[in-house]
């Protein structure tokens, strides 16, 4: 049998394995379809792991190729760090907004003290 036997068999409509002599073997066709679908699924997962490894800090700088478990672990660590940093920054923003509001009030108070007629205009 040549490497092209499957292609030749598909073109003639006959099964190359000799299992069935009919023009079309539904079981073989279903198996081939399933195998092709499974191969595409595995390729897609492999591509996604590669993409994830490239964007996750510390997973792309290793000399040896990181295992899938290491890639997922690093991704989880990166996400958790990002969430922690985000929470910390949110607290910092709230503190700065509070300080700004107090400073605006102080500016308005000092302006009113300096010029009582301008007490109506508050800095926004």
Curated annotation (Swiss-Prot):
Keywords: Coiled coil, DNA-binding, Nucleus, Transcription, Transcription regulation
Tissue-specificity statement: Expressed in D-type motor neurons.
Bias type Basic and acidic residues, positions: 32-44
Segments for region (Basic motif): 29-42
Ranges for region Disordered: 1-44
Region Helix-loop-helix motif, residue ranges: 43-82
Keyword presence, Transcription regulation: yes
Domain bHLH: 29-82
UniProt-recorded Gene Ontology molecular function terms: DNA binding; DNA-binding transcription factor activity; protein domain specific binding; protein heterodimerization activity
Subunit field text: Heterodimer with mdl-1 in presence and absence of DNA. Interacts with tdpt-1; the interaction promotes axon regeneration after injury.
Species whose genome carries this gene: Caenorhabditis elegans
Gene name per UniProt: mxl-1
Origin: domain of life: Eukaryota
GO biological process, one term: positive regulation of transcription by RNA polymerase II
Knockout-associated phenotype: RNAi-mediated knockdown increases lifespan, which is abolished on an mxl-2 or mml-1 mutant background, or by simultaneous RNAi-mediated knockdown of daf-16 or pha-4. RNAi-mediated knockdown causes delayed onset of polyglutamine-mediated paralysis.
Coiled coil residues, start to end: 86-113
GO cellular component, one term: nucleus
Intracellular or extracellular location(s): Nucleus
Biased amino acid composition, Acidic residues: 1-10
Role this protein plays: Transcriptional regulator which binds to the E box motif 5'-CACGTG-3', when in a heterodimeric complex with mdl-1. Involved in the control of lifespan in response to dietary restriction, the decline in protein homeostasis associated with normal aging and may overlap with the insulin-like signaling pathway. Involved in promoting infection by the microsporidian pathogen N.parisii. Required for the expression of svh-2 and the promotion of axon regeneration after injury.
Official protein name in the record: Max-like protein 1
């Amino acid at each position: 049998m040549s490497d092209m036997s499957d292609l030749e068999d598909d073109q003639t409509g006959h099964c190359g394995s000799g299992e069935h002599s009919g023009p079309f073997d539904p079981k073989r066709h279903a198996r081939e379809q399933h195998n092709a679908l499974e191969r595409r699924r595995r390729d897609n997962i492999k591509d996604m792991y590669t993409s994830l490894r490239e964007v996750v800090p510390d997973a792309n700088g290793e000399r040896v190729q990181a295992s899938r478990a290491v890639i997922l672990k690093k991704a989880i660590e990166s996400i958790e760090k990002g969430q922690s940093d985000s929470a910390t920054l949110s607290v910092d923003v709230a503190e700065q907004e509070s300080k700004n509001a107090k400073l605006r009030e102080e500016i308005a108070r000092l302006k009113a003290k300096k010029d009582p007629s301008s007490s109506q205009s508050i800095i926004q």
